[in-house]
């Protein structure tokens, strides 16, 4: 079966999310994160890992990328956001994903609740592969595309900046930021990683990365590698301590801008809990206005939502019988009478 898909957009910044938590982020005509059409494995997107430091057990806030069976799991799609509810080993996670209508950013808010009767110490680790290039160019030669991406860690803001160096004088520069903010709770120092090899490790995948294995040396911090790396990623880790019944909210924010100054301005803005809160309200208002502008009902929106999976992923079940296809002798203009541009 094809993945269920939800699309979130403000017209410039676009996010696709599947029911398992995979997907992509795009800005204008650029791929922000790496993605390949793979309806079976679906291992691409922006992810968040949770690890119990006392036991070494880890899982993700959605089914992807760890593929571990949760005690309870629910994916909820609405016009303005995507939600995931999950329970693992008496730890509840509730994730909301939305795109801001006023800035080119996506907000992933995760509320983590300790439902056990003991104090828990957890690692929260974000992860995404950064591209900032045309999707076709990255798909043809990803290793070459990676050579132009440079990363910079900003410890004072708990953020990572990435930029794509221009290949010629006429090429514009693009900037990306990746931020993790803990709301109302001090977790100590954050750690960072921008080298995929050091995060995943040799012979591993995103379901069992090297970075999620407890260190025998006792240090669980990421390496802090930055600069011109061969395979750029963005990953931030924070440690949280939760008493029984206690909750903490983690905001993971990513976005794009044309200059470094604008990017730092967005980082500063979305570290503020009140400004981040506005994203969900604005996204809901934007989705309602969009439906009204195109004269669509909620029933129409639900129909489009069911069809979008077959647009993003090739659906062989919709292909007609080969004998009928062979009989067709019309060109693209034959579609115009059905209001299809082709």
Language-model segments: which ranges?
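Anionic coordination/interaction segments
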Residues: 1-342
């Amino acid at each position: 079966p094809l993945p269920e898909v939800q699309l979130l957009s403000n017209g410039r910044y676009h996010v696709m999310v599947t029911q398992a938590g995979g997907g992509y982020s795009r800005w204008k005509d650029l791929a922000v994160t790496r993605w390949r059409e793979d309806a079976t494995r679906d291992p691409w997107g922006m992810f968040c890992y949770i690890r119990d430091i006392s036991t070494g057990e880890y899982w993700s806030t959605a089914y992807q990328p760890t593929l571990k069976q949760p005690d309870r799991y629910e994916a909820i799609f609405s016009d303005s956001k995507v939600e995931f509810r999950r329970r693992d080993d008496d730890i509840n996670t509730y994730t909301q994903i939305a795109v801001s209508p006023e800035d080119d950013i996506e907000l992933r808010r995760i509320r983590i609740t300790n439902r056990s009767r003991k104090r828990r110490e957890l690692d929260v680790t974000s992860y995404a592969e950064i591209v900032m290039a045309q999707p076709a160019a990255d798909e043809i030669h990803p290793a070459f595309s990676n050579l132009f991406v440079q990363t910079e860690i900003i410890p004072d803001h708990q953020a990572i900046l990435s930029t794509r160096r221009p290949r010629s004088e006429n090429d514009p520069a693009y900037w990306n930021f990746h931020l993790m903010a803990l709301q109302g709770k001090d977790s100590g120092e954050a750690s960072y990683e921008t080298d995929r090899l050091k995060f995943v490790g040799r012979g591993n995948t995103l379901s069992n990365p090297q970075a999620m294995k407890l260190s025998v040396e006792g240090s669980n911090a990421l390496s802090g590698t930055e600069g011109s790396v061969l395979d750029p990623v963005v990953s931030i880790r924070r440690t949280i301590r939760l008493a029984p019944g206690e909750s903490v909210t983690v905001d993971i924010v990513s976005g794009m801008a044309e200059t470094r100054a604008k990017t730092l301005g967005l980082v500063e803005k979305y570290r503020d809990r009140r400004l981040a809160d506005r994203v969900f309200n604005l996204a809901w208002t934007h989705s309602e206005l969009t439906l009204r502008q195109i004269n669509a009902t909620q029933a129409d929106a639900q129909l489009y939502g069911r069809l979008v999976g077959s647009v993003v992923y090739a659906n062989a079940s919709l292909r007609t019988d080969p004998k009928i296809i062979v009989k067709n002798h019309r060109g693209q203009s034959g579609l115009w009478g059905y209001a299809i541009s082709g």
